[in-house]
């Protein structure tokens, strides 16, 4: 053994000490603190609830019904009760743009299946990053191209027999085991657009109507804004009832006055009397070439102990067609925030609603609170929607004038060939 090795062994023997418990605790504390800081500032908050997450059990205490063993039975029973008033329902699928898939959920060279608007669709992205949407079922033997289908150039290939369909027009251009393509081998091609990180589809009952263009970008997001998270809900109601909330001025202070700490069901009495939310709202439609737009303006103040006004917010929003809302929130507390709402009818009485939140990076801790509070507030509306019926001719107070204006404005999204409820749910042979 060399003198050099003996020197280092002697040094380690005389100076080595076991790591103290205090040092280990310090390391763990630093690690946990770092992870928490990283989560607060860099991890988006995701909040998702479907009909199974609804607390339906309280209904059995107030309704004379047979108790089912499974929550799904109760949900289906209530949905059938609501459908009894189908004569009141407007067509379930209004004409317009619908956000049906996040851009991040579809990579180049991938195909996926989406069911919405009473249709099954295959959505695929070419290697050149172009998105195409076609009817999902192969005209050959009915395979779903969105489940197992592959992408080549701007085409999607059926997983069953490798029939190849072109995304630009839906035509079948190749059958690997045949020298010709049968006449009529074509899938319907849907008009689509990719904006603000979402893939949108144009739906129109007349099929000949040219769509209005979506504003690009809809919310004017710049480089200072980052994605902070989203929530996603499934709701048992007609699509029209959700955006109608913006024109229902009286509901804001009826449903959303109580402190969000009270939770998602504001009727419950809690011990939290710290303060309440106070709202002022205004809704108005656009006219002329922009008649497919409407505007909502909200003023919010949180009154601490019912006296001291704080957490003031000014909210301005645009309703784009039947399903899209872009909100801009200005607040001394939260700064400037962008919120996008996308509604997609899955079935005539089942809506998927997504809210996406954007803001500066530095307000990330406050955004977690904002998203949490907004989600709870929205769940209060969902409690109402899940258990109400649609009244075609409601009795309105004079203060409800904006609801009448909204319904007149929204009626433009129905046309002569819009499917009524019985047509949208008809299954024939």
UniProtKB/Swiss-Prot annotation:
- The residue ranges crossing the membrane are 23-43
Q: What is the designated name of this protein? A: Cholesterol 7-desaturase nvd
Quick one: where is this thing mainly located? Answer: membrane
Q: Where is the signal peptide?
A: none
> What else does the entry mention about this protein?
Nvd_Dm plays a pivotal role in larval development in Drosophila. On this basis of the prolonged first instar larval phenotype, the gene was named 'neverland', which is the fictional island featured in J. M. Barrie's play Peter Pan, where children cease to age.
Query: Cofactors per UniProt?
Result: [2Fe-2S] cluster
GO molecular function annotation: 2 iron, 2 sulfur cluster binding; cholesterol 7-desaturase (NAD(P)H) activity; metal ion binding; oxidoreductase activity
Q: Which InterPro entries match?
A: Cholesterol_7-desaturase, KshA-like_C, Rieske_2Fe-2S, Rieske_2Fe-2S_sf
Q: Write out the pathway annotation from the protein's UniProt entry.
A: Steroid hormone biosynthesis; dafachronic acid biosynthesis
Q: What is any one GO biological process for this UniProt entry?
A: cholesterol metabolic process
PROSITE patterns listed in its UniProt record: RIESKE
Listed GO CC annotations: cytoplasm; membrane
Q: What is its EC number?
A: 1.14.19.21
Q: Where does [2Fe-2S] cluster bind?
A: 138, 140, 158, 161
């Amino acid at each position: 053994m060399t003198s050099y090795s003996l020197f280092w062994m002697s040094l380690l023997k005389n100076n080595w000490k076991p790591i103290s418990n205090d040092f280990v605790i310090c390391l763990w504390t630093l690690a946990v603190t770092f992870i928490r800081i990283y989560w607060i500032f860099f991890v988006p908050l995701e909040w998702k609830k479907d009909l199974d997450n609804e607390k339906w059990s309280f209904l059995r205490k107030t309704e004379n019904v047979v108790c089912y063993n499974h929550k799904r039975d109760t949900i289906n029973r209530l949905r059938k009760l609501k459908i009894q008033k189908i004569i009141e329902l407007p067509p379930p699928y209004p004409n317009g743009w619908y956000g049906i898939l996040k851009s991040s959920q579809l990579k180049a060279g991938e195909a996926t299946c989406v069911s919405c608007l009473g249709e099954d669709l295959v959505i695929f992205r070419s290697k050149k990053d172009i998105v195409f949407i076609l009817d999902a079922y192969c005209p050959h033997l009915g395979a779903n191209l969105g489940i197992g289908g592959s992408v080549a150039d701007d085409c999607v290939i059926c997983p069953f027999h490798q029939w190849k369909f072109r995304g630009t027009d839906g035509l079948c251009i190749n059958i690997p085991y045949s020298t010709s393509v049968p006449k009529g081998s074509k899938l319907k091609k849907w008009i689509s657009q990719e904006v603000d990180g979402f893939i949108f589809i144009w739906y129109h009952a007349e099929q000949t109507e040219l769509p209005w263009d979506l504003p690009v970008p809809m919310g004017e997001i710049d480089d200072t804004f980052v994605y902070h998270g989203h929530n996603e809900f499934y709701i048992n109601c007609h699509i029209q009832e959700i955006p109608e909330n913006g024109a229902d001025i009286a509901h804001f202070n009826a449903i959303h006055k109580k402190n969000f700490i009270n939770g998602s069901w504001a009727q419950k009495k809690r011990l939290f009397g710290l303060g309440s939310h106070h709202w002022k709202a205004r809704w108005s439609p656009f006219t002329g070439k922009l008649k497919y737009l409407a505007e909502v303006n909200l003023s919010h103040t949180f009154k601490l102990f019912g006296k001291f006004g704080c957490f003031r917010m000014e909210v301005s929003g645009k309703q784009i067609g039947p399903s899209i809302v872009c909100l801009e929130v200005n607040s001394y507390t939260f700064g400037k925030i962008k919120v996008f709402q996308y509604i997609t009818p899955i079935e005539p009485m089942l809506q998927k609603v997504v809210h996406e939140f954007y803001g500066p990076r530095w307000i990330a801790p406050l955004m977690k609170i904002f998203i949490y509070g907004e989600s709870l507030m929205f769940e209060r509306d969902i409690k109402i929607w899940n258990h109400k019926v649609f009244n075609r001719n409601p009795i309105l107070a004079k203060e409800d004038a904006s609801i009448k204006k909204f319904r007149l404005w929204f009626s433009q999204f129905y046309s002569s060939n819009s499917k009524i409820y019985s047509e949208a749910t008809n299954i024939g042979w």
